[in-house]
Amino acid sequence: IGPREVDRLWSRHLLNSVAMANLIAPSATLLDVGSGAGLPGIPLAILRPDLKVTLLEPLLRRANFLTEAVDELGLQDTVTVVRGRAEEHRQTYHVVTGRAVAALPKLLGWCLPLVAPKGQLLALKGESAERELLEVHGILIGRRMTGEVVSVSAHPLAEPTWVVRIR
């Protein structure tokens, strides 16, 4: 998130991040791939203290920032920061999230191995959600998985957030 995004911090980034909270089962384990500034993982951890959240970030500078943020916010009991790449990570989770990481075909390759049986991938997407879901239709059929685009909103006045849900 750069300086030009300050005016849209709440609507585009924070509310956008928590909009998917109702799609996540109670007490789920959640992996935020390419966590960057901690979105959506940190806002979800604050809103949903029942979740066990892992923030996965390959860049040292960002991973250090995330560790400081988790400590400052007092989230050490529910949030873990891991420096690493999705394709090298081996643990599985009930929910894997991706926001502004990659196009859906690439994101699936990195994230599907990290989704536990009966788990789900929640990818925050913009208006490209339907198109990207069509691009991966064959992959999902081959894996006996389904995908849908869900429009969710954290607040009645907020812009809708488009989530591609893969299960």
Question: Which ranges hold each PLM region?
Answer:
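Conserved beta-strand/loop positions that form the S-adenosyl-L-methionine
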Residues: V33-S35
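Active-site phosphate/pyrophosphate- and oxyanion-stabilizing loops and adjacent acidic/basic residues
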Residues: V18, I42, G109
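S-adenosylmethionine
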Residues: D50-R167
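Short loop/turn and capping residues at structural boundaries
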Residues: R4-E5, A45, V81, S151
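Conserved SAM-binding loop of SAM-dependent methyltransferases across substrates and taxa
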Residues: A37-D50
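Class I SAM-dependent transferase core
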Residues: I1-L31, L47, R61-L75
